[in-house]
Amino acid sequence: MLTKFETKSARVKGLSFHPKRPWILTSLHNGVIQLWDYRMCTLIDKFDEHDGPVRGIDFHKQQPLFVSGGDDYKIKVWNYKLRRCLFTLLGHLDYIRTTFFHHEYPWILSASDDQTIRVWNWQSRTCVCVLTGHNHYVMCAQFHPSEDLVVSASLDQTVRVWDISGLRKKNLSPGAVESDVRGITGVDLFGTTDAVVKHVLEGHDRGVNWAAFHPTMPLIVSGADDRQVKIWRMNESKAWEVDTCRGHYNNVSCAVFHPRQELILSNSEDKSIRVWDMSKRTGVQTFRRDHDRFWVLAAHPNLNLFAAGHDGGMIVFKLERERPAYAVHGNMLHYVKDRFLRQLDFNSSKDVAVMQLRSGSKFPVFSMSYNPAENAVLLCTRASNLENSTYDLYTIPKDADTQNPDAPEGKRSSGLTAVWVARNRFAVLDRMHSLLIKNLKNEITKKVQVPNCDEIFYAGTGNLLLRDAESITLFDVQQKRTLASVKISKVKYVIWSADMSHVALLAKHAIVICNRKLEALCNIHENIRVKSGAWDESGVFIYTTSNHIKYAVTTGDYGIIRTLDLPIYVTRVKGNNVYCLDRECRPRVLTIDPTEFKFKLALINRKYDEVLHMVRNAKLVGQSIIAYLQKKGYPEVALHFVKDEKTRFSLALECGNIEIALEAAKALDDKNCWEKLGEVALLQGNHQIVEMCYQRTKNFDKLSFLYLITGNLEKLRKMMKIAEIRKDMSGHYQNALYLGDVSERVRILKNCGQKSLAYLTAATHGLDEEAESLKETFDPEKETIPDIDPNAKLLQPPAPIMPLDTNWPLLTVSKGFFEGSIASKGKGGALAADIDIDTVGTEGWGEDAELQLDEDGFVEATEGLGDDALGKGQEEGGGWDVEEDLELPPELDIPPGAAGGAEDGFFVPPTKGTSPTQIWCNNSQLPVDHILAGSFETAMRLLHDQVGVTQFGPYKQLFLQTYARGRTTYQALPCLPSMYGYPNRNWKDAGLKNGVPAVGLKLNDLIQRLQLCYQLTTVGKFEEAVEKFRSILLSVPLLVVDNKQEIAEAQQLITICREYIVGLSMETERKKLPKETLEQQKRICEMAAYFTHSNLQPVHMILVLRTALNLFFKLKNFRTAAAFARRLLELGPKPEVAQQTRKILSACEKNPTDAYQLNYDMHNPFDICAASYRPIYRGKPVEKCPLSGACYSPEFKGQICKVTTVTEIGKDVIGLRISPLQFR
């Protein structure tokens, strides 16, 4: 059972699917009716007018109506569009159990506890017939889907079939209108001839709760309190019991026929739903709930959906998956339909059956994997119990008869999933979740240990994607190692792009798009289920949800392309066509409009010519496109779309387009717009527009200041006059101050009653007459004449030397692609004649309109033009002012003959060649060659890509020492700087362009340094030894070697350094640990034991084993100590050491037990985690350092390696490159 939707509510007593929309009505025990959208999983509406439980509910097949019946004895007819009850039908005298519309006539059928069944005309709103005969509650009554029959079930233990053909004839006869007018007078409580009992079905031992007709066959199913489901057959004369389905252990609430298969569904108060096979009369499936009794079942009239109501709500479910199994390769689609494997050619649309499949499985094919090389398919089938899942291996016949295809012999085996991993190998995930590799004979060739997973997917030749609960892992089957992983829970489908460069991981409600290395490029969350997907040729992922076709671009943009009525499964996308399969496995082609995602893709890829073409020709409209362009930083493109002036204004300001902003501001004429435009124009130095903005907003103070700084004194005087007219004393005085007009300032101060200030201003500035006249106005008794400052200095605004008439000069920047197109559209369009070239006639132009072309399609340059037209000799014409004599200074006179040509007068320097260091970089991909050339940046990049170096601090000294060896210096001439020589290691055949630098560091040097490290280890100077080992390890990537043997020796040198660094670092750490508690002592012993598994020299291994032996003997772990003693004796130590060891061994063998359990298993191979110093046993996930190969637990991935101190743990790299041989 596949649950599609589930609700939690009061007890559900009635259910009804809408025939066309994804809606379901639920009637609840608390009197509420709910309308749900089961595809979107949302509650659309609630209807609450009944008093008490509502048991009957039904949608009308054509009208926007539904009917309900409740325990308040009322039948209500509702209009869900108007969201209200239209009317109520009254007549029943007890609870109403079911209500159903007739499929054709305007009738409603109701069953009630008043022991009657009534037929109502919902158009005339009257009862047209009462069916009496049952002598207990009538629990259910339903119309026959095509005949004039009614079936009813009652607690009187009978099922009755009623013939209502008389009612139909009466209501469709000419006198039917009169009978409606008479009302219900022709009906009495004891029934009439309108409806007669045709059959009474007796066989149940207790009350019958439900009865229903088969959609097409003369069958009836019933469920009763005797816990049985009975099947009845009927004909014109009689009805009889066919069979009984036993299995429920409580009252059967409801039973229905499957609309399209030979199945019966029933549910019961025993908290189960059961599926029965009609032909075998046996139970096929059982679905149980823990606490909820089931009360009602409903089947969708058109889709394979069912709904069941229970104590805590309801569920919408399917019995089996409807997703078709298919595989696409090139232009071919292979898919399974009706037990046939079919092949569809996308190009020719030829659809043929190529093979008949082996029967035997009752479950549909779950998935398919196609092998084009061998023309073979793997078909996986999932059982409800996963352990019973199987797969079939078929080879498709080459010359199959498409009319009557054969059923070739297939090879069937158990397994959850099978996918191809090579031309003649496939991988099987078995029921134990281990991976088997099989050949075409279905024989196991090898078993592969993989991390814990529950599903596998194809990931290219030799690779698989492994799914666990939280992530997807890319696994190399050949090398048996994990390459990458990405976090996404419960991936259902994996879709690779055609070139395998991108992959889409589809979960139930999420999509993650990754690159080949499984690095997540974008995450998309959907509220509705994701169904399928395919990659477009342009690299856009087209996917479907339950009700949409959508697109996703790898940058994270996604959107809706079109809506869907029913779910589809995309198989291929090409151009405007989406090829898909529907749930009936029918191939379909849907047309989509790709403009929106192609527009966004063109923007992302900076294909601006395509963008502009779409802007001008495509119908891209809507606020979302404008918002998208603004968000992505393309306001100038958004300007193309916008007609609304307010939006145009804000976009124009955003992209700094003052001209368009000015047009929009004039159209809007809003104060805020003018203010904003003024601010932006001021930033651009466009003072002419700033002036207009200040004038429009009447911002006189700013306008005056603008005139002052631009030196426009004429307009500043006008501003002074305006201020005087406006009686703005402050503004008037300020403008006078800007102009340096002293007499005007005196007049202003005098007019506003500031006599003292007016006098001081006049006297200080030498306006004596004015000062005297003001002095006379002072009253000596009441007013004092202010004193004049003898040291006063004249403050006068500087006179403008060059008034600024033009706008501030702006740098000439190249206009953006779109700004240029806007400008050309505006200016060029105004100058160009608005003529359609196709409408120009040829008569008036005559033959001159036709160009005479030569064979190559070029115009003969001189044809049709005489000498007069071209000018004889083709010298410069008089239109060019090139012949005017210029007066040049005499010192520029050039002696005759000096201008005789480049070879006589001027030295042309030779072109600069490529430097030797650049040649080195060009010729080599070895890091050391780039360091010797001084190109540290490229050397770092090579080290990063080859061995994963991310911290270059420790390399600084090595880089500088190596660079110093890359050149020689010599003195050429006295008093001149030294010159450099660049020695080549391939000097015999280097030539000018093939040189590579001589290298100072040799492999033998490092091997000699290794001996010193061994000596330091022997004398116990561990920390110093670790530093020396690390120095050798970091030097290895800077080697250059000539043959494969030396490459192997260098790699062996890395292994030696790693083993010693990990072991000695662990030993140093062990010695620092405290020894107070038992747990601390156990940890010390564990670390000593791990050290014995390092690959060291025998002399050092003896010392390590002696240490471990002593520690374990003291801890009384005699069994492990004995093992160490035996290993020590095998190495042949000194006689005194051997004697001591044998004594300890004999003591241990007397009591060969371990006193304490340690995290150490000597028999299980393991690697030591170089960070935590704990074992990583074989088969556990492990991350490695790309340079040293040191092992780490997965939690350390992405951190810096403790061994090298420079590399990133778990980084995916090319590998160590120290020889030109490795690049061939």
Curated annotation (Swiss-Prot):
InterPro entries: Beta-prop_COPA/B_2nd, Coatomer_alpha_WD-assoc_reg, Coatomer_asu, Coatomer_asu_C, Coatomer_complex_subunit, G-protein_beta_WD-40_rep, TPR_COPA_B, WD40/YVTN_repeat-like_dom_sf. WD repeats lie at residues 7-37, 49-79, 91-121, 133-163, 203-233, 247-277. GO terms for molecular function: hormone activity; structural molecule activity. The modification Phosphothreonine is found at T185, T591. GO terms for biological process: endoplasmic reticulum to Golgi vesicle-mediated transport; intra-Golgi vesicle-mediated transport; intracellular protein transport; retrograde vesicle-mediated transport, Golgi to endoplasmic reticulum. SUPFAM superfamilies: WD40 repeat-like. One of its GO terms (cellular component) is extracellular region. It is found in: Cytoplasm; Golgi apparatus membrane; Cytoplasmic vesicle, COPI-coated vesicle membrane. The modification Omega-N-methylarginine is found at R965. It comes from the Eukaryota. The coatomer is a cytosolic protein complex that binds to dilysine motifs and reversibly associates with Golgi non-clathrin-coated vesicles, which further mediate biosynthetic protein transport from the ER, via the Golgi up to the trans Golgi network. Coatomer complex is required for budding from Golgi membranes, and is essential for the retrograde Golgi-to-ER transport of dilysine-tagged proteins. Xenin stimulates exocrine pancreatic secretion. It inhibits pentagastrin-stimulated secretion of acid, to induce exocrine pancreatic secretion and to affect small and large intestinal motility. In the gut, xenin interacts with the neurotensin receptor. Oligomeric complex that consists of at least the alpha, beta, beta', gamma, delta, epsilon and zeta subunits. Interacts with SCYL1. Interacts with JAGN1. Interacts with TMEM41B. Interacts with SVEP1. Probably interacts with PEX11A. This is Coatomer subunit alpha. It comes from Bos taurus (Bovine). The lineage of its organism: Eukaryota, Metazoa, Chordata, Craniata, Vertebrata.
